[in-house]
Amino acid sequence: DKALRSLRSRSFFLELAMEHYADELLALCGVGRTNLLYTGGGHCYLLLPNTERVRRGAAAWNARFNDWLCAQFGVALFLAHGFTECSGNELINHPAEDSPYRQMFRRVSSALAAHKLRRYDASMLRRLNGRRADGGRECRICGRTDSLVDDRCEWCRLFVELSEKVQRCGMYYVSADPGAAYDFALPAADGTAYVAFMDEKTARGRMNGGGAVTRIYSKNMAYTGLRYSTRIYVGDYAYSNSIEQLARSAAGVKRIGVCRMDVDDLGQAFVAGFERPDR
């Protein structure tokens, strides 16, 4: 089932989707990536204007993105959001003895938790409950029953195909033009974004030829003179793409193990704040 390739591209897809979500929200609010405080691991923190227009826009964009996630992946994926008002003093943790920075992040976390507990409105629940399985065979990777080819659904086939491109291609070109070649589509705040994986030469040629471009994500490198480009960090290294070859390299029994690492309590660290005892 090419599980190794699928795992890599699934993880990358989630990171790229999160970057895209944040960039669309920033553009919707009329600010740049300077206002993106942190993104990674399926989370992001942004500093946005405290206006009614921004609050409505953020809520509408979140609802649109979750509608798309639900249509594509059912209840397996959901993007919760929450926000709170804050002042300049809270951002610089003043007065420090009152820990306003910590309280600010606690308010955000509470709003986020509340959204997770109430994910769907009545119309979405009716849509989910109205779905009926077609009685066909299930995808042998994820269990979906629609659009199977070789016992794989559309997204699982895509993730296998993308794995090689994640390693080989250094540019991820986002455009609103459905006529150009693309690898997959994501929702945009005002339409659809089409994502194509390519090398630098192809990306520059497409731009110089007048091709539509919304933004470009460059892998691990910052490119001078390449407009619309944002560097993102991608772990594209691999000893081998073959599980069999990895197993043959083992000492003793020819099999592999999986090591999964994570940063403990990263969210709690943001909530608690990074206070300096001497200040």
PLM feature segments, named:
Residues 1-279:
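Regulatory and interdomain segments flanking nucleotide-handling catalytic cores
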